[in-house]
């Protein structure tokens, strides 16, 4: 059984017991979160596709950890002018473990 959920403007294919890295959620570690923006649920041959979301579809998950991703360096420069700009960015994320998929 698997499902496709939307979180943080991205779509993720998940199944029970899987740990997924999502955009940062303001929920404490160890808490339970429910996702109701479920776009598809597949259980063998029984497939439910929403338009855009499945009515009554719900995914429950437990927040495992919060953190920041690897650093990405942004560099801007103009040739022959000795103009150089450096900027770094680290995106926040939340790891969640899928505990249940329901329709």
UniProtKB/Swiss-Prot annotation:
InterPro entries membership: bL21-like, bL21-like_sf, Ribosomal_bL21, Ribosomal_bL21_CS
Keyword rRNA-binding appears in the UniProt entry: yes
Keyword Transferase set for record: no
GO cellular component, one term: ribosome
One Gene Ontology term from the biological process aspect of the record: translation
Keywords on record: Ribonucleoprotein, Ribosomal protein, RNA-binding, rRNA-binding
Highest taxon of the lineage: Bacteria
PROSITE patterns (UniProt xref): RIBOSOMAL_L21 (PS01169)
GO molecular function list: rRNA binding; structural constituent of ribosome
Similarity comment: Belongs to the bacterial ribosomal protein bL21 family.
Function: This protein binds to 23S rRNA in the presence of protein L20.
Subunit architecture: Part of the 50S ribosomal subunit. Contacts protein L20.
Protein name: Large ribosomal subunit protein bL21
Name of the gene: rplU
